[in-house]
Amino acid sequence: MKFIDRIKEDWSKVKDKPAKEKWEFFWDYYKIPAICILLVVVLLVQSILTSSNRKAIVFSGFAINCKISIKEEAFWDGFYEAAGIDGETQTAACYSDVQIMPGQIQLNNNTVQRIIAGCAIQDVDFIAGDPYAFQVCAYTSQRLFVDLREFLDEETLAKYADRLYYMDNAIIDMLNAPVGEQVEPNALEYPKDPKKPETMKNPIPVGIDVSDREDLQKAYYLDGTTIYVGAIKSTARPELTKQFLNYLLK
């Protein structure tokens, strides 16, 4: 017998009964299916409401060794306004749950691998970090950062020349040398001052010192820490990333 026919037969037995008996019959025989259907409806409604309230991520990056403060929202609201982003339906994802620390090899490797994975799927637009963290990211063999000479106009580069972070591309070449000729990262001698390209063999500007941004300092409890920001070479949102760098320089 089909399920629907069984229901019709069962209800025919109680159709002339009082409402109370009908309800008792229904509850005795169909309470489990009814509860299951109710749960499915509740979950479906909850899923629809959650999806409708979820903001679309239109920009993302990593803030390494940073801690979020109550000022973070105000910082990003300022950028949304400058970039024409609708903060009601769109948002930026700034991942500050990552660390890169001197002597913490495993921790650093995990962080770098997470960043590289995000860059590989074009889900990362920028990286911000203190001098040590930024150096570790700059000198990965994957060349994560874009050459700012190809990203920002000459006027901006000239105006902020004393704030540019340079990496020595000759070191990356050594890391990517043929097997047998490679040099271990720990054995390399990195530039002592990333703002002095004249001390490097093949300097490339990949970051900007934005430590003077008071709202950024307050947003992530930086307490005067030197912070560099660089654009990711694989970004799928280059124009928005340019706007972000220019916003930080204002």
Functional labels for PLM-detected ranges:
Residues 242, 246-250:
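Extracytoplasmic/luminal low-complexity segments enriched in Pro/Gly and acidic/polar residues
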Residues 108-198:
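Extracytoplasmic "Venus flytrap"/periplasmic binding protein-like
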Residues 7-20:
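Short, membrane-interfacial amphipathic segments enriched in basic
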Residues 1-4:
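N-terminal targeting leaders characterized by basic, low-complexity, disordered sequences
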Residues 20-29:
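Aromatic- and glycine-rich beta-strand/loop motifs that create alpha-glucan
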Residues 220-237, 247:
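A bilobed periplasmic-binding-protein/Venus flytrap-type ligand-binding module shared by bacterial periplasmic
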Residues 53-134:
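Early extracytoplasmic/lumenal segment of secretory-pathway proteins
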Residues 29-51:
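Hydrophobic membrane-insertion alpha-helices, especially the h-region
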